[in-house]
């Protein structure tokens, strides 16, 4: 289901893509934006499992992140996130 896909951990997804935080607290991390890689304007809330890119003015769930990172639509993002090689929430 879509709700199950949204539970995929954004932090683990970014780590699997080789994207690590520039600054981190127990509840969130600041990253170089995977959408617009110029400054550490990309925030991930680890508690809510949501992201926001202050430079691009966009944010949302892991589905939205995949859509923006790969310039694909909603259905393609769902298919992408259903790949067995991706990190899953236990």
Where do the language-model regions lie?
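N-terminal structured subdomain of primase-like DNA metabolism proteins
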Residues: 1-90
């Amino acid at each position: 289901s879509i709700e199950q896909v949204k539970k995929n951990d954004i932090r683990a997804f970014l780590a699997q893509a080789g994207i690590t935080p520039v600054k981190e607290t127990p509840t969130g991390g600041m990253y170089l934006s995977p959408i617009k890689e110029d400054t550490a304007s990309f925030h991930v809330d680890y508690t809510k499992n949501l992201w926001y890119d202050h430079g691009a003015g966009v944010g949302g769930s892991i589905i939205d992140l995949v859509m923006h990172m790969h310039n694909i639509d909603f259905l393609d993002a769902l298919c992408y996130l259903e790949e067995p090689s991706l990190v899953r929430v236990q």
